[in-house]
Design a protein with these regions (language model features):
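An anion-binding loop in the catalytic cleft
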Residues: 1-93
């Protein structure tokens, strides 16, 4: 799916039901994200700020996220304790 479509779903599905992904059995709801221009394998986390490749040299940069059962967090706060690191692939999670 294109980065633009994913951004549209994030914005269109907020606040409910929301756009989410599953990583290591946990659900993460993306609350805010922007379009970015980086390349990598689809679903690959490109840096330590949770920028996720979507192909065609485009990616989504997550700005706000909510881990299942937790409060919403800005991405800087979230990444301090996150197990999702650069190089992780969310397609294989």
């Amino acid at each position: 799916e294109t980065a633009e479509n994913i951004i549209g779903k994030i914005n269109g599905l907020y606040p409910s039901p929301g756009a989410f992904f599953i990583h290591k059995g946990e659900r993460y709801k993306i609350l805010k994200a922007d379009l970015a221009y980086s390349s990598g394998e689809n679903g690959e986390v490109l840096n330590n700020y949770l920028e996720i490749s979507c192909g065609n040299k485009k990616s989504i940069k997550v700005l706000e996220i909510q881990r299942q059962g937790k409060r919403p967090q800005n991405i800087n706060e979230f990444m301090l304790g996150s197990q999702i690191k650069k190089g992780s692939n969310l397609n294989n999670a």
